[in-house]
Regions:
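Histidine-rich, glycine-flanked metal-binding segment
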Residues: 1-4, 9-53, 67
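Divalent metal-coordination and catalytic microenvironments
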Residues: 8, 26, 47, 58, ...
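Metal-associated gating/positioning segment near the N- to mid-region
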Residues: 45-117
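Histidine/acidic-residue-rich, glycine-tolerant segments that coordinate divalent metal ions
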Residues: 97-108, 113-198
């Protein structure tokens, strides 16, 4: 598919000007004034600002939460449609490892949730709920084979997403060795649970 956007206002770090933008197979291939190219679709962007789509790096679609059957309200269809209406063209969601199971099982589940439903592009971080020493090689494989280079760990929500200090240390050490990224949900979940129960 090819797209020609005519007469749009383009703002860069150093310029502010009007031009045409030619897109082939979802890649911008030409920017210039009065482009003369054949395109399957043409959009007149006169008096309009042309900006790239936004990226939402933190979504939770169909996230199960706890034993009561609570699930976040948006699925991949409603969530990505809403994102597209707001100008977001990529989301990054969080497959959630079940305790005692492989991160690859979580990834497969999340791909199935997204399959055929997404209105926009998506990628993944990985929520880790436990990680024994023997499964640490999964982290390198996630990065190399699946492009997942960021992991989220929770210090909150005991019995749901909370990771113990051993898991926290093992995953942080491995991430440091391989140059991947850790996202922390940093609260004292044990103390919060005590306060809520008192």
């Amino acid at each position: 598919m090819s797209l020609l956007i005519k007469n749009g206002r383009i703002v860069t770090a150093v310029d502010d000007y009007y031009a045409d933008i030619f897109v082939e197979k979802e890649i911008v291939t030409l920017i210039g004034k009065n482009l003369s190219v054949n395109a399957e679709t043409m959009v007149d962007a006169s008096n309009r600002l042309v900006i790239p789509g936004g990226i939402d790096p933190h979504t939770h679609f169909e996230l199960p939460f706890g034993k009561e059957g609570i699930v976040s309200s948006d699925d991949f269809e409603t969530g990505t449609r809403a994102a597209a209406f707001g100008g977001t063209t990529t989301i990054i969601d969080f497959p959630t490892q079940e305790k005692g199971h492989s991160t690859f099982a979580a990834l497969e589940t999340w791909h199935k949730k997204a399959e055929g439903k997404c209105a926009i592009d998506y990628g993944f971080h990985m929520i880790i709920t436990d990680m024994e020493e023997a499964r640490l090689p999964e982290l390198r494989k996630l990065a190399d084979d699946e492009g997942i280079t960021s992991y989220k760990l929770f210090m909150a929500y005991p019995d749901v997403l909370y990771v113990d200090d051993g898991t926290l240390f093992r995953v942080m050490r491995k991430a440091g060795e391989q140059g991947t990224v850790i996202c922390m949900h940093a609260e004292n979940g044990i103390v919060i649970a005590e306060i809520l129960n008192s």
